[in-house]
From Swiss-Prot:
Chief site of localization: membrane
Annotated source species: Glaesserella parasuis serovar 5 (strain SH0165) (Haemophilus parasuis)
PANTHER family assigned: INNER MEMBRANE PROTEIN YHJD, UPF0761 MEMBRANE PROTEIN YIHY
Transmembrane segments: 32-52, 89-109, 124-144, 170-190, 202-222, 234-254
Family statement drawn from the similarity comment of this UniProt entry: Belongs to the UPF0761 family.
Family matches, as InterPro entries: UPF0761_bac, Virul_fac_BrkB
Record's subcellular location: Cell inner membrane
Protein name in UniProt: UPF0761 membrane protein HAPS_1376
Keyword line: Cell inner membrane, Cell membrane, Membrane, Transmembrane, Transmembrane helix
GO annotation, cellular component aspect: plasma membrane
Length: 282
């Protein structure tokens, strides 16, 4: 019980230190700028890999629903139009879009390193390679996960009359599992410091649960109290998406802080880190 109380106090202390609300606002702004380039890069990877053709549609649905719950169709329509327009640009412009997409990963890197209180910086070249690898391999990982799970559950033994007919209910958890794995990989790889897998996994579970619950609550609020539609009319999708992206980044950063505080507690118990709560009193 004492450990739980100490964890809660340390979590609140770090929340005040880390300026989560400020960083989530900064990441929201960066996301809005890099949204089209990011989606263009992600789905260009799938175009080069026909094996993921079936999984692409499912992944698109997952992406658009998470970017703007309750307005996914409208967001998808506009974003796909913007992406189609970007395909008509020259090579220099496309390189510029890729750089903008990389800037988003860089912003996430800076925010998470601040949460982990890490002052070590990667070299520019290494940073660019890491960011580009995340852009390329994250969609491949997501596509492979969807493709493999779809194949497994299409087997006869998993049919409604098969031996494992109950498994169809497990399909509902695939989006949550993918979200959890994505958060865990971000917390594990992006910070330029050693992060234990169990810390990243627990932090990702915290973020995944609140992200999923938050999305359902957000959808309920938007559909029950449609004040945005009444005020903004056809433009209501824009503020809805901005608010949701901001809330999403707060959840992602809080999950990272959860993992960071777990590491801090281990170091404090081992005598490798001074207790920041007693330091502040002094």
């Amino acid at each position: 019980m004492k450990n739980l109380i100490f964890f809660f106090k340390l979590f609140i202390h770090r929340f005040q230190q880390n300026k989560i609300a400020v960083y989530s606002g900064y990441l929201t702004y960066t996301t809005l700028l890099s949204l089209v380039p990011l989606i263009m890069v992600v789905f260009s990877v799938f175009t080069l890999l026909p094996i993921f053709e079936q999984a692409t549609a499912q992944l698109k649905e997952l992406v658009y629903d998470n970017f703007a719950p309750s307005a996914g169709d409208m967001v998808q329509q506009y974003l796909e139009m913007f992406v189609d327009n970007s395909k008509k640009m020259g090579i220099i412009s496309i390189i510029g879009l890729v750089v903008v997409a990389v800037m988003l990963i860089s912003s996430i890197d800076n925010a998470l390193n601040e949460i982990w209180h890490n002052t070590k910086k990667r070299s520019v070249i290494l940073s660019f390679v890491v960011y580009l690898a995340v852009l390329i391999f994250a969609p491949i990982f997501a596509g492979a996960s969807i493709a493999i799970s779809s194949y497994i559950f299409s087997l006869e033994m998993f049919s409604q009359d098969g031996l494992f007919s109950f498994s169809h209910h497990l399909l509902k958890f695939i989006p949550f599992v993918l979200t959890w794995l994505l958060f865990a990989l971000v917390y594990l790889i992006v910070p330029n410091t050693q992060v234990k897998f169990r810390h990243a996994a627990v932090g990702a579970l915290f973020a995944g649960v609140f992200f999923t619950l938050g999305k359902q609550i957000f959808i309920w609020y938007i559909t029950t109290f449609p004040s945005y539609q009444a005020i903004y009319g056809a433009l209501a999708t824009i503020p809805i998406m901005i608010v949701w992206i901001h809330l999403s980044w707060q959840v992602v950063l809080l999950g990272g802080q959860f993992a960071s505080v777990l590491k801090d507690m281990e170091m404090i118990k081992a005598g490798e880190l001074a207790n920041p709560l007693t330091e502040d009193r002094e």
